[in-house]
């Protein structure tokens, strides 16, 4: 059993240890370069430091009032959809009103036509039978 565990642990922890060592080496090298830069070019180092401070201040100041609203687009879409629904409902109401007006006009026209017709007795549905000889 230990023959399987040791290679598995090596495979798992080996890359982690190697990457940690590389990171430590690079950080030490960077710190060394930074110290040399401070000693050799103090004016340049100071101007870079001030420039970085100004940049960070500008970033902080520009982001003070910013509020990221990830749902703003969705809210606008919902408002648009609601306005479209309202327009559609208004259009339907207008169509219904127009249909009602047309029906009323047709009824009025029919009533006027009936009033204009002379009163004639209704015609019999069947013809009078004649006596057979």
From Swiss-Prot:
UniProt source species: Dictyostelium discoideum (Social amoeba)
Subcellular location: Secreted
Keywords for this protein: Secreted, Signal
Superkingdom field: Eukaryota
Main localization, broad class: secreted
One GO CC term, this protein: extracellular region
Name of protein: Uncharacterized protein DDB_G0282951
Stretches with biased composition (Low complexity): 96-118
Region of interest called Disordered, as start-end residue ranges on this chain: 82-133
Taxonomic path: Eukaryota, Amoebozoa, Evosea, Eumycetozoa, Dictyostelia
Signal peptide: 1-23
């Amino acid at each position: 059993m230990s023959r399987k565990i040791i290679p598995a642990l090596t495979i798992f922890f080996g890359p982690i240890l190697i990457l940690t060592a590389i990171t430590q080496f690079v950080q030490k090298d960077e710190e060394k370069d930074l110290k040399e830069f401070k000693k050799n070019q103090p004016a340049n180092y100071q101007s870079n430091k001030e420039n970085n401070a100004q940049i960070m201040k500008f970033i902080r100041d520009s982001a003070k009032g910013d509020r990221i609203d990830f749902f703003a687009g969705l809210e606008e879409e919902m408002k648009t959809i609601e306005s479209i629904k309202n327009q559609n409902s208004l259009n339907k109401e207008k169509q219904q009103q127009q249909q009602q007006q047309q029906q009323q006009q047709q009824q009025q026209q029919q009533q006027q036509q009936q009033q204009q017709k002379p009163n004639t007795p209704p015609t019999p549905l069947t013809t009078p039978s004649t006596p057979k000889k």
